[in-house]
From Swiss-Prot:
Gene: Tmem160
Protein name: Transmembrane protein 160
Signal peptide annotation: none
Effect of gene knockout: Homozygous knockout mice for Tmem160 are healthy and fertile and display normal motor function regarding coordination and locomotion as well as similar somatosensory thresholds for mechanical (tactile) and heat stimulation as wild-type littermates. Homozygous knockout male mice show a delay establishment of tactile hypersensitivity and alterations in selfgrooming after nerve injury. Conditional knockout mice lacking Tmem160 in sensory neurons of dorsal root ganglia (DRG) are healthy and fertile.
Residues bearing the modification Phosphoserine: S48
S-S bridge residues: none
Swiss-Prot/TrEMBL keywords: Membrane, Mitochondrion, Mitochondrion inner membrane, Phosphoprotein, Transit peptide, Transmembrane, Transmembrane helix
Keyword Membrane: yes
GO cellular component: mitochondrial inner membrane; mitochondrion
Length: 188
């Protein structure tokens, strides 16, 4: 499949991003033994971060769009594979075995795309300038799309498996006069 280089980059960014959040929070100090060299004292103590430029916003927007495009590409491939599985299932008995393979391939594409999107979103939330709520909404949308796909495939496969008509055994006690339970006339 290739493209393994970006996983290393995402892992590095995730380590850099979450390194501080995994450590216990430091207690605020009010001077004490360290004097004016303690954190929170000095000319930059109350300084705010520099304002975000238009170039930074454009970069963040492009990164978000590229990230979403990658997920949509995986999801499209999963839908395409599932559609081929549906067609294969309808063709012949030999196609039924192949259809399960196509459904599995579609599921792998959908799961891989959703997982890589969620991991990338968590790792690149800072450079994308996304709030926690925005990232959670993105992951929720991906989960909803994946669950919709899984439900559609599950219902379709269940419908195909239940397509067998059960014929009750005729022990001679049933009368053939008059309509049956469904209201159909008796066969002639």
């Amino acid at each position: 499949m290739g493209g393994g280089w970006w996983w290393a980059r995402v892992a590095r960014l995730a380590r850099l991003r979450f390194r501080g959040s995994l450590q216990p929070p430091q207690r605020p100090r009010s001077g004490g033994a360290r004097g004016s060299f303690a954190p929170g004292h000095g000319p930059r103590a109350g300084a705010s971060p520099p304002p975000v430029s238009e170039l930074d916003r454009a970069d963040a927007w492009l990164l978000r769009k590229a990230h979403e495009t990658a997920f949509l590409s995986w999801f499209r491939n999963g839908l395409l594979s599932s559609g081929i599985g549906v067609i294969s299932f309808m063709q012949s008995d030999m196609g039924r075995e192949a259809a399960y393979g196509f459904f599995l391939l579609g599921g792998l594409c959908v799961v891989w795309g959703g997982a890589s999107y969620a991991v990338g979103l968590a790792a690149l939330r800072g450079p994308m300038q996304l709030s926690l709520a925005g990232a959670a909404a993105g992951v929720g949308a991906v989960l909803a799309a994946s669950l919709l796909w899984a439900c559609a495939v599950g219902l379709y496969m269940g419908q195909l498996e239940l397509d067998v008509e059960l014929v009750p055994e005729d022990d001679g006690a049933a009368s053939t006069e008059g309509p049956d339970e469904a209201g159909r006339p008796p066969p002639e």
